[in-house]
């Protein structure tokens, strides 16, 4: 019996030890037990648990939270104090957000407020709102308790010094570019001011004030100002005023204005005033508020302030007019005028030109002409410039160059009437007609030629206006130049003609115009002709030139003796595309030779219609030629139709001349004209050239 009792007692003791060991080494059970105690707010059980297992108060649960976190959330001050007295980790937490002091601050109504000097941020994005509860007084007491036991305030109020930022263009007075603070309520700020009485901790006050200003927390900032809490922060009042202006909030700025701050004092390292920053931020309401409270717009960096006003994306004219109306004097008229021209603010430009400006550089006139293209403003500028035949220093460009570069001839006429030289050169040797051919339409070219511009002028590379038109593919400009004496075969310094540029540009129409006006296809530079200088693949201009080459040979057989013709034919025979075109041309010419008809004893073929020297003789047979079917003629159809049209015009001119002669001689009874038959009359008149016929008949 005694043995049984003894064994039973031993077994109970062993089980108790096993349970104790299991409890001791089962973390989950230990934390679960602690959590239940914390939820029940049972101080006695917590005291017993701490006495038996003190290590449990610094263990993380599955959510990576400490018991102190849970105690803070349940707002039991006695339990929090007990945990702290037993060396609970007060500055623990994997992230800044999970530090006990941060959790207590959030529950006490604190929200993280940000300021960022390095990057302009809208006020709505400077505040990160976090979860808060209604009853925050007890959490405020917990915050006091945590601070008393050594909680690190840097977790809830911190800034970062960015050395690279100090040399930037932003205006700051402190070296802090980024900061945040959870002290966003009056009770919490009272705690902060009590705990940061030493000057070495004033930076936390400064961070909190700046965060409150940037977050547009009107109530809190008003508390700071009314209780004179901005004084002991080791920062000038102007620095906080700068932060207030940066918020773009008139209400925030008005708090400082009502406190009696000097509105015209400099508030940044660059000696700018509050008005300057308000203009820079394009805030019309804030600008008006500052001006109504006595801000002087005529002190500090007036040029930059007016420049920012003009460059405003929305309120440029309005801001400029407000500043000028309130006394801002324009000292750098030329620079301000350039800014206004860039933004095309005509009212500002007119105002500046109405001022007594002593000197205007010619570059402003060029800029105004090119950017604005405004005739009235250009007239006003011309009144202030004595000599318009002066070039800009940078590019040696003259006002006439700017005028012809735009698609309006009004400004060109205005400058010419004021005495502009139409043949003046820029730094590249280009005259106004060069630029007109490059950028403008035919209107400016007409004005320049009418006023004596040289159509064959070369630039520094030997390029003529006709070559520019060929290169740019401007057919109408090219036709007008050719009609006014442009040399179709003039070369540049590399021995390239206008035809070379047209073929390089693959411009079929430009090539056709040049060839119709006598462009030489056999002219050679050092190695090439206009045809051989470019590859034939996918270039319709080369194919057209080959067709005209054959047409030229038909009308002038001496071309075959030129070296350029030999080079062209070698090129044609060496390429598949041009060789195929050559076969088609020769086949079509054969068909035209076989297509014949007779007029009396005279045999005429369709091939004869291609020969220019025979057109005058063939004019009498135009009715027969018109009946010929041209379906098989594809390559030379254009030439035949053109020549038929010429013969029709010649016939009409002959009929007109005969009518005039008959009418004139009918009044002279002694005239022997009527002794001749009408057929002989026609033969006599047919011997006249087309030019003579036009002169007599007035036919066009």
From Swiss-Prot:
This is Putative ankyrin repeat protein FPV018. Keywords: ANK repeat, Repeat. It holds the Pfam family Ank_4. It comes from the Viruses. It comes from Fowlpox virus (strain NVSL). SMART domains: ANK. ANK repeats lie at residues 29-59, 63-92, 126-155, 204-233, 236-265, 270-299, 301-332, 395-424, 428-457, 461-490, 494-523.
């Amino acid at each position: 019996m005694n043995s049984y009792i003894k064994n039973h007692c031993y077994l109970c003791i062993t089980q108790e030890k096993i349970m104790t060991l299991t409890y001791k080494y089962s973390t989950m059970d230990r934390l679960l037990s602690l959590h239940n105690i914390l939820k029940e707010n049972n101080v006695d059980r917590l005291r017993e648990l701490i006495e038996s297992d003190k290590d449990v108060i610094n263990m993380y649960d599955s959510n990576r939270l400490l018991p102190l976190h849970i105690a803070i959330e349940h707002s039991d001050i006695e339990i929090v104090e007990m945990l702290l007295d037993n060396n609970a980790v007060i500055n623990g937490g994997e992230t800044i957000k999970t530090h006990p002091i941060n959790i207590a601050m959030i529950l006490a109504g604190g929200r993280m407020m940000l300021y960022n000097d390095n990057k302009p941020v809208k006020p709505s994005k400077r505040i990160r709102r976090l979860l808060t509860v209604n009853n925050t007084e007890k959490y405020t007491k917990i915050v006091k308790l945590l601070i008393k036991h050594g909680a690190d305030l840097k977790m809830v109020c911190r800034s970062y010094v960015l050395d690279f930022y100090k040399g930037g263009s932003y205006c700051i007075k402190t070296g802090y570019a980024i900061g945040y603070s959870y002290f966003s309520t009056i009770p919490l700020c009272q705690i902060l001011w009590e705990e940061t009485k030493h000057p070495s901790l004033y930076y936390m006050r400064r961070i909190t004030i700046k965060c409150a200003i940037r977050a547009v927390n009107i109530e809190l900032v008003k508390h700071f100002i009314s209780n004179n809490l901005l004084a002991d922060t080791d920062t000038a009042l102007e620095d906080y005023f700068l932060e207030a202006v940066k918020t773009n909030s008139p209400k925030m700025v008005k708090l400082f204005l009502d406190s009696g701050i000097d509105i015209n004092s400099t508030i940044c390292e660059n000696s700018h005033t509050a008005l300057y920053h308000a203009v820079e931020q394009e805030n019309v309401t804030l600008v008006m508020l500052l001006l109504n409270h006595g801000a002087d717009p005529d002190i500090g960096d007036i040029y930059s302030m007016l420049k920012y006003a003009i460059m405003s994306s929305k309120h440029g004219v309005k801001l400029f007019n407000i500043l000028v109306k309130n006394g801002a004097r324009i000292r750098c008229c030329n620079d301000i005028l350039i800014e206004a021209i860039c933004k095309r603010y005509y009212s500002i430009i007119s105002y500046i030109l109405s001022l007594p400006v002593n000197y205007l550089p010619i570059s402003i006139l060029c800029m105004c002409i090119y950017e604005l293209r405004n005739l009235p403003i250009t007239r006003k500028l011309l009144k202030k410039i004595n000599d318009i035949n002066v070039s800009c220093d940078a590019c040696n460009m003259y006002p006439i160059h700017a005028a012809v570069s735009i698609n309006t001839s009004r400004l060109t006429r205005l400058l010419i009437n004021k005495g502009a030289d139409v043949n003046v050169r820029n730094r590249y040797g280009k005259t106004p007609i060069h630029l007109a051919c490059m950028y403008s339409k035919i209107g400016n070219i007409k004005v320049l030629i009418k006023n004596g511009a040289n159509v064959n002028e070369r630039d520094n590379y030997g390029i003529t206006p006709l070559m520019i038109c060929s290169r740019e593919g401007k057919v109408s400009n090219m036709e007008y130049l050719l009609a006014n004496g442009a040399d179709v075969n003039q070369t540049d310094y590399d021995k390239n003609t206008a035809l070379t540029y047209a073929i390089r540009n693959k411009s079929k129409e430009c090539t056709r115009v040049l060839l119709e006006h006598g462009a030489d296809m056999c002219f050679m530079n050092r190695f090439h002709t206009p045809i051989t200088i470019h590859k034939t693949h996918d270039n319709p201009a080369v194919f057209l030139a080959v067709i005209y080459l054959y047409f030229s040979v038909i009308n002038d057989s001496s071309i075959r003796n030129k070296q350029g013709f030999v080079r062209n034919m070698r090129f044609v025979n060496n390429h598949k595309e041009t060789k195929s075109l050559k076969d088609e041309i020769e086949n079509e010419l054969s068909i035209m030779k076989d297509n014949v008809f007779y007029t009396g004893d005279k045999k005429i073929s369709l091939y004869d219609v291609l020969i220019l020297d025979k057109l005058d003789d063939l004019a009498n047979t135009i009715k027969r030629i018109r009946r010929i079917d041209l379906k098989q003629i594809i390559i030379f159809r254009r030439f035949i139709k053109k020549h038929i049209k010429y013969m029709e015009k010649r016939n009409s001119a002959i009929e007109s001349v005969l009518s005039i002669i008959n009418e004139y001689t009918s009044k002279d009874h002694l005239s022997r004209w009527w002794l001749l038959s009408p057929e002989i009359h026609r033969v006599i008149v047919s011997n006249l050239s087309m030019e003579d016929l036009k002169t007599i008949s007035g036919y066009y």
